Regions:
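Membrane-anchoring alpha-helices and their flanking helix-loop junctions
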Residues: 1-96, 108-175
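Solvent-exposed interhelical
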Residues: 99
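Extended, alpha-helix-rich binding/interface surfaces that flank or overlap catalytic cores
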Residues: 104
Length: 175
């Protein structure tokens, strides 16, 4: 990858990241918290402390997975998490790191963050947002993303799809 390519890609990374992960994991949950009047958890209860701890761990793992997969899109795929030429989706299929175990580790990271937020706040509203997000992803990935990836990467994606599960990670890495 050339220096010019890297310079031209930084703003695409920023826009892609702001459009998808930041909106889904920060903006929408913040609006829900404000609209529902959700307050900070009362840390006097062992159950609440447990929920906050588990939630914080889910958020940390989710952020780590999200950052790792975005970095792989850049370094291996030479693109961003954006779709189409404008935002620079990867020109090469990414089949490294967590992509060897599961086809959607980036979404898994976002799911970890959303579920963690629901746990930390003990909010049914944020749990509902998590469920809505899952439902939308189930439909979008199956009926839009996978056909798009098949058209873009052809036989390489077909082989990847046959060998790596969509949601439940493989125990051993593929390849």
């Amino acid at each position: 990858m050339t220096t010019t390519h890297t310079r031209n890609l930084w703003w695409r990374h920023l826009i892609s990241f702001l459009i998808a992960p930041v909106t889904m994991t920060l903006v929408i949950p913040a609006l829900i918290v404000i609209a529902a009047g959700i307050r900070a958890p009362d840390l006097h209860s062992p159950i609440t402390i447990g929920l906050v701890t588990v939630g914080a761990l889910l958020i940390a793992v989710g952020i780590g997975l999200l950052v790792w997969t975005v970095a792989l899109f850049d370094r291996v795929g030479h693109g961003t998490l954006g779709v189409g030429n404008t935002l620079g989706e990867p020109v090469q299929l990414v089949v490294r790191g967590p992509y060897r175990q599961v086809r959607n580790p980036m979404i898994s990271g976002v799911l970890g963050i959303l579920l963690g937020e629901a746990a930390v706040t003990a909010s049914g509203w944020l749990l509902l947002w998590f469920a809505v997000f899952v439902a939308v992803q189930l439909i979008a990935i199956r009926f839009w993303e996978e056909p798009h990836l098949h058209r873009r990467y052809g036989a390489e994606y077909a082989e990847y799809r046959r060998n790596v599960p969509r949601w439940i990670p493989r125990i051993s890495a593929w390849r």
